[in-house]
UniProtKB/Swiss-Prot annotation:
Protein name (Swiss-Prot/TrEMBL): Histidine--tRNA ligase
Compartments reported by the entry: Cytoplasm
HAMAP family cross-referenced by the UniProt entry: His_tRNA_synth
Species of origin: Chlamydia muridarum (strain MoPn / Nigg)
Lineage per the UniProt record: Bacteria, Pseudomonadati, Chlamydiota, Chlamydiia, Chlamydiales
Database matches in CDD domains: HisRS-like_core
EC code: 6.1.1.21
Single GO MF descriptor: ATP binding
Family matches, as Gene3D superfamilies: Anticodon-binding domain, Bira Bifunctional Protein, Domain 2
Keyword Cytoplasm on entry: yes
Length: 428
């Protein structure tokens, strides 16, 4: 049986060797996820795990005119007719969780997650209907240094996994007054050429004007380039905030570029927005993004609380790492015990358990293969060490361990071999 998965989903699998699908290797995923956990812990952020599905109304708050709500969600009715939606993004779910646990909510909530998201997106390279997101939400504090701190965390994550040629592109959308002034200017600008815009941008003109700037349609690009810049409509107080964040990025050595056409696909963003991109020649593509959303908590029924966050698509991160030729992590070196016949089975079972208690990852090949076949299988499966156990080893308690990567062997009494294995594992 093959090819039975629905479109847009994939397995993260431990035995992937095909170079085309190497990005699906589970150890590679585990390494990237571990880096995210480690960096978040260093910055004092705590993990949250929200349900895979929630009431549909939870996600309507991201904006009724956003692409997610209009056409990308997996929504269904349960057996009692209640509308439920598979989680399409993390921020609304985190805000809902904080409000549900309001008695435990802090003045400064520092939350992160690594979770699958679900969107019914058009099939194309790098886009999946179930994708995995590393996200972070800092809810409760509005300060330029908080924004810079979150961007620093994201930058440290990219550095930890080995991404190169990264840049932060930033824009400032301002608050309600700024947006109102800018919307008026933008509407006036696009109105005179409305019939020349793409069908999608004509729809956005009436429903979500700012998203025209996010259009990728060829017929829109010349108009977008000539459109007014929102930075010309930001008041002095907001501009000082923006400048303070940029000054701190400069201190941190994080390369950035002001992109006045940058908008985000969700309606809740205010003030600072950004995308983290990898730059290749004259082209760039996003590996993450986010911004400030100071009104969403109140819109969700909670108190007025400022917030700043981001989301990173792990599929794109891992694929880009491979495209950039990053040094791939190696799996922990395991020992494979190979009993030569049934008489050695009980000993291997007991010894494997003891070795695991010592911290040596150990498995047993119970198939009683011929030595040549067993060695070939171990090599193909990238096993670190191999030890055959037969009648002679059982009687003398002397063992030979083959290092499969160095093509060398070491031998000795059982306790000596154990000490050497512990050393090799700890110093791998």
């Amino acid at each position: 049986m093959s090819n039975v998965l629905p479109k847009g989903v994939f397995d993260i699998f431990p035995y992937v060797t095909n170079s085309k699908n190497l990005w699906r290797n589970s150890f590679l995923w585990k390494t990237v996820e571990h880096a995210a956990h480690r960096i978040c812990n260093l910055y004092g952020f705590d993990e949250i795990r929200t349900p895979v599905f929630e009431k549909t109304e939870t996600f309507l708050r991201v904006g009724e005119h956003s692409d997610i709500v209009k056409k990308e969600v997996y929504t269904f009715l349960d057996k009692k007719g209640r509308s439920l939606t598979l989680r399409p993004e993390g921020t609304a779910a985190v805000v809902r969780a904080l409000l549900d646990h309001s008695a435990d909510m802090r003045k400064d909530n520092k939350i992160y997650y690594i979770l699958p998201m679900f969107r019914y997106e058009r099939q194309q390279s790098g886009r999946y209907r179930q994708h995995h997101q590393f996200g972070l939400e800092a809810i409760g504090v509005r300060h330029p240094l908080r924004d810079a701190e979150v961007l620093s965390l994201l930058w440290d994550f990219y550095a930890a996994v080995g991404l190169k040629h990264m840049q932060i592109q930033v824009n400032f959308l301002g608050g309600r007054k700024t947006r109102a002034r800018y919307d008026e200017a933008l509407r006036e600008f696009f109105r005179k050429d409305l019939d020349k815009l793409s069908t999608l941008s004509q729809e956005r003109f009436h429903a979500n004007l700012l998203r025209i700037l996010d259009s990728k349609e060829p017929e829109d690009q010349a108009f977008i380039e000539q459109a007014p810049s929102i930075l010309d409509y930001v008041d002095d107080q907001d501009l000082n905030y923006f400048d303070s964040v940029l000054a701190e990025l400069k201190v941190l050595g994080i390369p950035y570029k002001i992109n006045p056409r940058l908008v985000r696909g969700l309606d809740y963003y205010t003030d600072l927005v950004f995308e983290a991109v990898t730059v290749v020649g004259d082209h760039s593509y996003a590996l993450g993004g986010g911004g400030r959303y100071d009104e969403l908590v109140a819109q969700s029924g909670g108190p007025a609380m400022p917030a700043f966050g981001f989301g990173v698509g792990l599929e794109r991160v891992i694929q880009t790492l491979l495209e950039q030729g990053a040094a791939l992590p190696t799996a922990p070196r395991r020992l494979r015990l190979i009993p030569m016949d049934e008489s050695a089975d009980a000993f291997c079972f007991s010894w494997a358990k003891h070795l695991r208690h010592l911290g040596v990852a150990t498995e047993v090949d119970w198939a009683h293969k011929k030595p040549k076949t067993a060695l070939k299988d171990a090599a193909d499966q990238q096993v670190g060490f191999v030890c055959f156990v037969g009648e002679q080893e059982l009687s003398t308690k002397q063992f030979i361990v083959k290092d499969m990567s160095l093509h060398q062997s070491f031998s000795g009494a059982q306790q000596d071999v154990e000490q050497r294995l512990v050393y090799e594992v700890q110093n791998a």
